[in-house]
Amino acid sequence: MRSVSYVQRVALEFSGSLFPHAICLGDVDNDTLNELVVGDTSGKVSVYKNDDSRPWLTCSCQGMLTCVGVGDVCNKGKNLLVAVSAEGWFHLFDLTPAKVLDASGHHETLIGEEQRPVFKQHIPANTKVMLISDIDGDGCRELVVGYTDRVVRAFRWEELGEGPEHLTGQLVSLKKWMLEGQVDSLSVTLGPLGLPELMVSQPGCAYAILLCTWKKDTGSPPASEGPTDGSRETPAARDVVLHQTSGRIHNKNVSTHLIGNIKQGHGTESSGSGLFALCTLDGTLKLMEEMEEADKLLWSVQVDHQLFALEKLDVTGNGHEEVVACAWDGQTYIIDHNRTVVRFQVDENIRAFCAGLYACKEGRNSPCLVYVTFNQKIYVYWEVQLERMESTNLVKLLETKPEYHSLLQELGVDPDDLPVTRALLHQTLYHPDQPPQCAPSSLQDPT
């Protein structure tokens, strides 16, 4: 395990308190560049843009915000900002700039003003975690909300009007699932048949697949809760498929997080069954692949830190997303598909963490790590890229270059003679003023 040091960092001002899932990265204004969204317990959403230390704009919500998200939740072809409070208030913000420009050619309808939601609706309270994704394979995105009482609910936006620009609909409840343990993460991954599957983490490094049975329903649209409580319990039990990832669990109640749909390459390389990762508060990390018969464990790593957040991020640029896990003390682990581990230390305690693409500088999205500390600061480490995950040395790098072998042949050095090539490289790097030693025997250390 090697350590890396990222030095490109910006500090953002944030004086509020937040829940772990009230932070995300996404394109809130539909300009193809991602912003940072943070919601606090006072009901304020701060949107940060570029490397400005102060929020680009703020939004006012009702209640304590527990989760925020960015996505096309209304299926209108543009992203909206979603904020959900613990009291059950669902807020939608349209932060796309107006099409009409002012005299200077800038959109100033948003900047400097506190934004009000374009839509607000009350849903069941005690929200904890949120997901905006297509969970049933119909091409439309749904809203999935996890609750503190071990319940998960799925909603869909139902449009009531004809206008494509204005929101004239409402959220309609699709299904309610009852889980055995606390819900800490929601994610979607590709199943063995290539269709999306809704996953929810369960304590003890376990997870459950939630079946979207409304796809089979015909007739009336899905109701919010069903006719009676008794008619819900039996289907709910059938529609939750629990998976234990280990026969030996040290603590079956330990908090667990998961992330799914981990990319395995560009284009056709990323097709097939989805990869997903799990982490626990006692330091267990696993990468798994969902197979048709049984899940396949690709690797398992045990660390001595309390892991509270799990993300995915392509830090090498090869299309393979690495698993990123963060601990409360700022220790961050980046692990690739081959179990190569790189760690990065932030010298402060962390209250919330996220990773993804963010347009911090240079007018483009780059891989970023975002840490919310306890000292009223948010640290954004941008351009967190690595040339490779595995450890290497100069000789191995040079051996991949054809001109290296031709130069050694000119000097009469055998490329397979490692002591001689190392001595030659040492002399070239540290004693270039000395005359070159062409004979292989003269390159060897007399001692």
From Swiss-Prot:
It is found in: Lysosome membrane. The keyword Signal does not apply. As part of the KICSTOR complex functions in the amino acid-sensing branch of the TORC1 signaling pathway. Recruits, in an amino acid-independent manner, the GATOR1 complex to the lysosomal membranes and allows its interaction with GATOR2 and the RAG GTPases. Functions upstream of the RAG GTPases and is required to negatively regulate mTORC1 signaling in absence of amino acids. In absence of the KICSTOR complex mTORC1 is constitutively localized to the lysosome and activated. The KICSTOR complex is also probably involved in the regulation of mTORC1 by glucose. This is KICSTOR complex protein ITFG2. FG-GAP repeats lie at residues 19-48, 126-155. Keywords: Lysosome, Membrane, Phosphoprotein, Repeat. The lineage of its organism: Eukaryota, Metazoa, Chordata, Craniata, Vertebrata. It comes from the Eukaryota. It comes from Homo sapiens. GO terms for biological process: cellular response to amino acid starvation; cellular response to glucose starvation; germinal center B cell differentiation; negative regulation of TORC1 signaling; regulation of TOR signaling. Transmembrane segments: none annotated.
